[in-house]
């Protein structure tokens, strides 16, 4: 009987090991594709990924979220209801980044120092932010993204934020949803127009 029990235990251990190995392989394959399901995925993404899709990341508890290490990144997509905790979001010095898409109800920190910084991304073409994302952030600065053509936000984004636009010579359209920057105390638009017509639309739906 004891031998049978030992065999059963060995089989159980092997089964557990096989499951663990399978889970590790699935995580590795997922991360190689730039898919994020939790904070561990994000921390272990290969720096050479060209696309990042954040499906879920409620357990990310750092105040700073910095994408700047991903120098090969072309597409950044964050699905709804992600990243409730970070108060400083940096998307900076990414030479190949073309598209940023952030879903609804992301980034809900109301820290006094909360800020979104999108700077020095020379290939960036479009930035889209869904309803109620960054609602209580205090600063939104987007600068030195010469190829950016379209900036779109849903409703209730950055309701109290200082808004800075600088060095956006290619900008064609700014589309702001309801209540965006409604209580903003400071807005700076510098070098964004370059004599070209920029269409600004209010109360847009994303």
Language model features: what each stretch is:
Residues 4-5, 174-177, 185-206:
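Leucine-rich solenoid repeat scaffolds
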Residues 42-86, 94:
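LRR N-terminal entry segment and analogous cap-like coil->beta motifs
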Residues 54-59, 78-84, 102-108, 118, ...:
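Concave beta-strand-loop units of leucine-rich repeat
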Residues 47, 68-71, 84, 92-95, ...:
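Inter-repeat linker/turn residues at the boundaries of leucine-rich repeats
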Residues 10-11, 15-56:
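N-terminal capping/linker segments that flank leucine-rich repeat
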Residues 38-46, 63-69, 89-92, 116-118, ...:
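Leucine-rich repeat
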Residues 72-77, 90, 96-99, 117, ...:
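Discrete beta-strand positions within long extracellular beta-solenoid architectures
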